[in-house]
Amino acid sequence: MSRLENSTKNFVLTLGNNILSSLLGLVSRTVFIYILGSTYLGLAGLLGNVLGFLTISELGIATAIGFSLYKPLAEKDYKSVSALMSVYRKAYVIIGNIVLISGIILFFSLDFFIAPSQQPKGTTFAYFAFLFNTVLGYFLSYKTTLISSDNQAFRLVPINIVMNVMQTVAQIIVLVLFKNYTLYLSVQIVCSFIIMLLQNRYITRKYKEVDFYSKEELKPEQKSSLKRNIGGLIIAKIGDYLVNSTDNLIITKLVTLAATGIYSNYLLIRNMVNGYISTLFASVTAGIGNVVAVESDERKEEVFNIMMFCAYFIYCFEAVCFLCLFNPFIGDIWLGENFTFNTFTVFIIVINNYLTGLRMPLITMKGAAGTYMEDAWIPFAFAIINLVASIILVKWMGVAGVFLGTIVGSLLTADWYRPIIIYHKVFHTSVMKYYKRYIAYIVLGLLNMCIAYVGCELVKIKFVFVGFIVKIIISALVPLIINTALFYRTKEFNALKEMGNRILTKIKSKLSLN
């Protein structure tokens, strides 16, 4: 099966899994909120971020191992694959124990993150449930890196779908019958354990040539590459945590735990949609790694430009829909106005997400090319600026200040420096072409958002659902019409259209088989 076929299959099947998971997640979240309230939502988000600090000890080993597996898998060098996976397994056993011990110690600092007066019933059990789930992943999930690097992750989708359905149904039943957060988390732990066991069993059977307990030594060049990449990823992991996991901490500490719960609803929808988009980029990462290894610099840059346009087209569409539909959906359709932020805060959240989306091609190319050391300082500097700016701005602007701080951090670090590394180290050409495209995409994105938002604000229909449908139509048509009119003659647009046609063909073939 070709790289393209594998990438398409990865995308289609994983997309289907994500859509089903999203629908189940919305139903589960709705039941959760109406039975347990937003405080428990805030607790879940906060604990995830607090314990996320412990995953720094992973030090980017999964990413480095995944990159190192591309070549031996392509060459069917199973001795090298076995050696790499054995090192990976041993490292994760050590890390799992470190995380467990560190988590127990960190528990005694929980009152710093959540004042005792704000801690709902079951907080202690919830903390250790989250900790156990985190540790479980280190002991049981390492093999999934192998199947992902082999561009075969789609084969795990049936397992994921069945277990996601079972977990969601079981959790809803527990909430309705017992109204108990402890039992809700217990179901999650049991299902996580089962899904990891099933995935492990499948991967072990599929890769019979791989000895996960191999005593084979790594080749000198493999050791050197791993050390170099892990060295660059250590700072990146710390920085990424501080950038991505401190928002809830700051909101809880300087605003309220309830505000964290409200934000978690926006985050749920954002993560659902971003999950679909990330599936597209993740499904082609292994293929991009192959392109970087064998194609010319011109071809690499051409592929990157296509990825960048795809990111703009998709994330611009997403940003317009988020800006116009977030509050109408959450406030009017789903939960009520008490669970929404003001328009300015939503706008800042959307802009932050849009800029993150535009960086996705850089992250994908960086992972495929293995350029980890060259910009290792970026996440750390990004994190410091983000933290300082967010703490200052949150006192002045409230929740919006947290996300504005993230935007400031990204513009002053990753957004201007990371492209230099990719263009100089991978494409061996000037980075100015990238900056021109990037600025143009930001301006066009803002233009799309403003036009669509003004159009939606003009909609004054008495019936809420009818008005919401009209806003959906406006939000969808504005970016589609503007961007199609501007780019329909470009090769990047044609490449996106061909990709869409291939995906639709694959979906139709799957439906016809069923």
Where are the regions that the model predicts?
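Membrane-proximal transmembrane or re-entrant/amphipathic helices at the cytosolic face
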Residues: 427-430, 453-514
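Hydrophobic transmembrane helix module of multi-pass membrane transport proteins
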Residues: 91-239, 244-245, 453-454
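Helix-loop junctions and terminal segments of transmembrane helices
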Residues: 59-75, 149, 208-212, 266, ...
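Interfacial/gating helices of multi-pass transporter permease domains
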Residues: 32-56, 84, 181-186, 221-229, ...
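Interhelical loop/hinge segments that connect adjacent transmembrane helices in multipass membrane
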Residues: 1-7, 183, 199-245, 287, ...
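Alpha-helical transmembrane segments of multi-pass membrane transport and lipid-handling proteins
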Residues: 89-116, 169-176, 197, 301-357, ...
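N-terminal membrane topogenesis motif
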Residues: 1-26, 79-86, 121-123, 199, ...
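Short runs within selected transmembrane alpha-helices of multi-pass transporters and secretion channels
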Residues: 17-25, 29, 47-55, 59-66, ...
